[in-house]
């Protein structure tokens, strides 16, 4: 099975995986509206891959089979200053 990956034109580090290039039939319209104009990043055979950057390959495969798409959002940013302040016992 081929997988097409698109990056969001509105949200940084947000990617949409779909089963077929330029086929967004299974993606909810509300998600596409939030995502903006999809920009193709790559197309690859997902069956031959063992890993995918920060995405869990098993979750991507399962989502593609069940829903027809997978949305990868960036992990939350860590506020190092806030963590350091807490470690020092400083409260806001």
Swiss-Prot record:
Gene3D superfamilies: YcgL domain (3.10.510.20). Coiled coil: none annotated. Residues 1-85 form the YcgL domain. This is YcgL domain-containing protein Shewmr4_2172. It comes from Shewanella sp. (strain MR-4).
